[in-house]
Amino acid sequence: MLRIAVPNKGSLADASIAILKEAGYNQRSDSRDLILVDSENNVEFYYLRPRDIAIYVGSGELEAGITGRDLLIDSSAKATELLALDFGGSTFRFAGPIDREWAVSDISGKRVATAYPGLVAAHLSSLSISAEVVRLDGAVESSVRLGVADVIADVVSTGNTLRQAGLKIFGEAILTSEAIVISRTGFDIPAELEVLIRRLQGVVTARRYVLLDYDIPKINVETACAITPGLESPTISPLQKPDWVAVRAMVLRKDTNRVMDELWNIGARGILVTDIHACRL
């Protein structure tokens, strides 16, 4: 039976359970449950601390898991990213006191507080910068004011928390992270894991795209197909009205309204948008 690690708490937990449910897997209904056996799909799910998942997978105790890219890299575990899941996005950045200008080179000889010491140490080493990395498990942004560190490296979303702590971001992003599926490096992927990856990829794609249907005069079909090329090509069907055809194509969800406007402007009518709940491409 395939053994999969799932985050048991934090920002990744609910979204991980949601995508697994959409992919057809049973999930726990009680947050106190540590294990769920999905006999129908021949999978056991283990609910673990997100930071520990890469360790379990890398050691071979579990075949795969869902965790953050930042947590995988920080762990130095022998695990490999298989699939990005399009949620749990964050950026990992340096930040220093707002009362001076900072460059990454200024970190040399300084103290850097972070909850991701492995990731930060590896990044500084790649830049040939020598600095003391101070590990903290939380409230990293308070470390400068309390005199524990000179700068910090932390996950940033809006930056509001940093500004409230008197800090500002500097330098390029250290890492862009999101939720990912991982497996042990060099591990021969079993059939059950291939199915899970294929299902999750289908959900990710379904969330990313919508299905667009519209009618268009034949004379404008070429222009319309350039606007909605689809993944392979659009489906074109004849209509009872001889000078018109029906077109169906997948369109990126984020582009939906712009595409509808462009189609309307070239004479398309009956433009309909349908959500995609699952797919295999």
Predicted regions and their residues:
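Short, structured active-site "lid" loops
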Residues: 42-61
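Small-molecule-sensing regulatory modules
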Residues: 1-43, 47, 67-80, 85-91, ...
